[in-house]
Amino acid sequence: MLWAVVGHSISKGTTNFVPVKLFVLGRPGSGKSEAYRQIDKYIQQSHKNWSVIHFTDYEILQEMFQFEKYFQLNEKLRKFQPREHEGFDVRDFSVLDDVLKELEKKIRFRVSNVCNEQLIVIEFARDDYGKALKLFSPNFLKDAYFLFINSDINTCIQRVHDRVAHSSSIDDHFVSDDIICSYYKRQRIPFKLERVDFLNSNKVQVITTKMHLINNKGSQQDFTKKINRFINSIIKHEEQEKSSSILGEALTQWGHNHILVRASKLRMRAVSLLRN
């Protein structure tokens, strides 16, 4: 009886699909976009029941830059500085906070109706990731995974120049040496991100400890293996969680059905006794 209920739960798909969020963090040129491309390739090959959606803050920043370029005539009020290769530097870093808030809205809108197993890859670069991640709502960060890709400044700069010279993707945009050596010089990584609950200022809510670090200093093959291994661990964990959830729902349903059956039998017995 119990396993029949479990089978019914699985066939009916009683567990709702909840997208899994993966934040991919690191300096420009560290390998974030390359990591996404490998994630997408690996999932298509090895986990065909999953799909991947990619979000970056750069698209929003670029839209803001283009709008300012044509409509903000007052040079002093401009928040972006045009650079070579159709790139730009951020002059007013407050826009970086605004962009992340807008990014959350964009993601929530796009993934409001999920009909399969889905991995949401969210990519951005900052100097202080603890501060940046606190701009997202706690519910949005709940159960998310975090991948920080580490690479030294000189390597990042060289990769940026190489990708601009030999562009093969829309993600191959230019970032100036100046901004990499100044704003992105330090990388603060929150291995334990905490937020004060404003309804109770004495309470601290732990948001996540799921921060994984990969050093992208070796060969492309080595980097690929690290990415595949990490993604496989995420999917394995999520599928185990889903199986546990389905079993829990089945047990609850079985218990409910069992009580109804017993109640029905007792009622029939009582009616029989009254008639006698």
Predicted regions and their residues:
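Glycine-rich phosphate-binding loop used to anchor ATP phosphates in small-molecule kinases
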Residues: R83-L141
